[in-house]
Amino acid sequence: MKKIKLLLCVLLAVVLLAVGCGGQGGQGGEAPAGLPEGFVYLAEAVPDVILEIRYYSSYNFLGTRVDDYLVPVAIISSEAAAALAVAEANLRAQGYVVKVFDAYRPQGAVDHFVRWAEDHGDVLTKAYFYPDLAKDRLFPEGYIAERSGHSRGSTIDLTIVDMQTGKELDMGTPFDFFGTASHHGSDLVDAEQTANRLILRAAMEGAGFVAYEEEWWHYTLAGEPYPDTYFDFVVR
């Protein structure tokens, strides 16, 4: 176990060096064109991840493409990208690949979420994403808020895919399911689904991320570089 932890630490150091020196926006390097300093395109920093950017599509709880997602890419802080590379390597060694649903999220997109939540007549996606909640409860119960940690640039929504079957592991709920079944430790999911969540959690926490207890897919880098800054540049 100590050897594994040492190898992961070495890998993290190597990735941090590569990100910083490779023009990926880390300290000492220029950001990719169009990105603020300190941010990278995830597909360039961690090439083996699968991207399924839900807010660029209509396959999300709004039922439409979200404002300010102009292209289906994932943007993230350099530090979070380096840490994710460590988690990805850990999971790949176990036969899994990372699939990312969202990373950096513009404040303009969060504002779109708020407008949608305030339109109580729009319940197009209720049956799939929030079947047990009235829409007017999404704000009071904290599922929608006027600010998101994603806008600080070091939070990521993801799952894992079995490399042999090409299928996502069964986590018990879809991504962005509003309900207690999405919580870590929920008794509404079975033992296999709980075990699958723990595979993801162990890899992410081992790489320096912190789990959000109410969403199995949501992780934030501990010691994130911009803890008090909410960015609003578009995803392009």
Describe the function of each predicted region.
Residues Y219:
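Conserved metal-phosphate-binding beta-hairpin within the catalytic cores
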Residues L17-G20:
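C-terminal motif of bacterial Sec signal peptides marking the signal peptidase cleavage site
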Residues M1-L8:
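Bacterial N-terminal signal peptides that target proteins for export
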Residues L12-A13:
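Core hydrophobic alpha-helical membrane-spanning segments
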Residues G22-A103, Q107-E214, G223-R236:
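Extracytoplasmic cell-surface/polysaccharide-interacting catalytic and binding patches
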